[in-house]
From Swiss-Prot:
This is Cytidylate kinase. NCBIfam families: cmk (TIGR00017). GO terms for molecular function: ATP binding; CMP kinase activity; dCMP kinase activity. Keywords: ATP-binding, Cytoplasm, Kinase, Nucleotide-binding, Transferase. It is an enzyme of class 2 (transferase). Disulfide bonds: none annotated. It is found in: Cytoplasm. It catalyses: CMP + ATP = CDP + ADP; dCMP + ATP = dCDP + ADP. Its main location: cytoplasm. ATP binds at residues 11-19. It comes from Polynucleobacter necessarius subsp. necessarius (strain STIR1). Its EC number is 2.7.4.25.
Length: 215
């Protein structure tokens, strides 16, 4: 029996891949996996437990102990709604730092693959197109300039009532891009066979339509 189809969407931080992926899933009636949220959940849980972000072994052992669930666009960790808590910049930076550990990536592989259910799945995040779902029917690398991404993130934070400085966000994104692209484990790169979608000058609706047309 053939496995349900997967659309895998990757790209740099704040490229809009999560928004596009969730809307594509909604249009197709597919399940949705935000793999980046899983790393943010590990970041939040490890911070609460005081685990050093450099301790890959201890972080890897933490993953199986976490009770994670996605319900109606809300994300729960051990029964607590942490949808907003995992989106703050400090947790994003911590998630990027701990994602370099192979122990964590290995621990999350099985969890991510469990989301592959009928009628299909749209998965966004690092590794989805190369390691987690190498047989994805469509692989998309969604990108935009650092300036465009910083501007989008700034608007998102301000809309949520969170104070932010555009220049600080731009610097953080540039540093994360450099770290994500150069790390030895799962670096940021275009997967074999992936289509590149540059969204600096595209609206969300235009990006979603492009992905649907490719599918």
């Amino acid at each position: 029996m053939s496995l349900p189809p997967v659309i895998a969407i990757d790209g740099p931080t704040a490229s809009g891949k999560g928004t596009v992926a969730s809307l594509v899933a909604e249009k197709l009636g597919f399940h949705y996996l935000d793999s980046g949220a899983l790393y943010r959940l590990v970041a939040l849980a490890s911070e609460k437990q005081g685990i050093d972000v450099k301790n890959g072994q201890e972080l890897g052992l933490l993953v199986p102990k976490l009770l994670i669930s996605f319900k109606n666009s809300q994300i729960f960790l051990n029964g607590e709604n942490v949808t907003d808590a995992i989106r703050v910049e400090s947790i994003g930076l911590r998630a990027s730092a701990l994602a370099v550990h192979p122990e964590i990536r290995s621990a999350l592989v099985g969890l991510q693959r469990s989301f592959r259910q009928s009628p299909g799945l749209v998965a966004d995040g690092r590794d989805t197109a190369s390691v987690i779902f190498p047989d994805a029917i469509l692989k998309v690398f969604l990108t935009a300039t650092a300036a465009a991404r910083a501007g989008r993130r700034y608007k998102q934070l301000i809309a949520k009532g969170i104070s932010a400085k555009l220049e600080d966000l731009l610097q953080d994104l540039q540093e994360r891009d450099a770290r994500d692209s150069s790390r030895g484990v799962a670096p940021l790169l275009v997967a074999d066979g992936a289509k590149v979608l540059e969204t600096s000058d595209l609206s969300i609706d235009q990006a979603v339509k492009t992905v649907l047309d490719w599918y």
